[in-house]
Amino acid sequence: MKQDDSQIIDYLIRGNEQSNLNKPLSYSYIANPDQTIRWIYPSKLKTPTFLNFYNSSSLRAKIFTVTIKILFALKLSNLIKSNKVYLPIHEGSLLQRILDKYPDYNHSIFTGTVGKNRKIIVELNNGYKSLVFAKVAISNTSKDLIQNEFHVLSKLKHENLTSIYVPEVLAYNEKDLLEISNIKPKRCKQPSKLIDVQIVALTQINSINHKYVQWKDMQAKFEIESLIENLKVKV
């Protein structure tokens, strides 16, 4: 396990010096080509809900996704090229607080893309379907991104949007954590290119901050008319 990954995991599972240690739990993880951790999940996980983090729009990604699902369905997940690690989760640690809030849920973890925007996402599921995503900031930049996401979702919640489903904000603190609901249907397809419904959704979002005014009321009316007249003269 690389040092960056160890630091990320420690950030999740470490408590203070006085906190008690739980019995180490067995986790499996799937690595990227550079051997950094991509997903980490309890070894007893029965459904590969961590695939909700994965963009499966390309043919190669679709094949990978289907293969993983088949192996889990046949209880052959041990054939997946993964590694195991035992993690002692501290009482009071960030991960333990999240799990305590959803005691009946299973979970998996996406460790984020390396860089200043990196954040951790803890996925919580009922054994079959992802229900909650807890986003954890690990830098000032990712903290700002999570804060911005909270404000955007809060604003969209009060808009009359007919083509968009907006995740519900379940919890938020300004320090490092945003919890949102999963709105992705159990059965859905990810298109490889922009489609009509996405264009309509983007148009609705774009219209939120637009304000329509009559031409006669525009402050720049006379400046624009003057520029047009100058163009006519030059022509």
Indicate where each model-derived feature is located.
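Conserved short submotifs of the Hanks-type protein kinase catalytic core
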Residues: K175-K186
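Conserved kinase catalytic-core helix
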Residues: E149-V166, K184-L227
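An alpha-helical support segment within catalytic cores of ATP-dependent transferases
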Residues: S93-Y105, H210-V235
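Protein kinase glycine-rich loop
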Residues: G112-V114
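Juxta-kinase regulatory segment immediately upstream of eukaryotic protein kinase catalytic domains
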Residues: K2-F110
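Short beta-strand micro-motifs within the conserved protein kinase catalytic domain, predominantly
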Residues: P167-D176
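ATP-binding glycine-rich loop module of kinase domains
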Residues: R118-N148
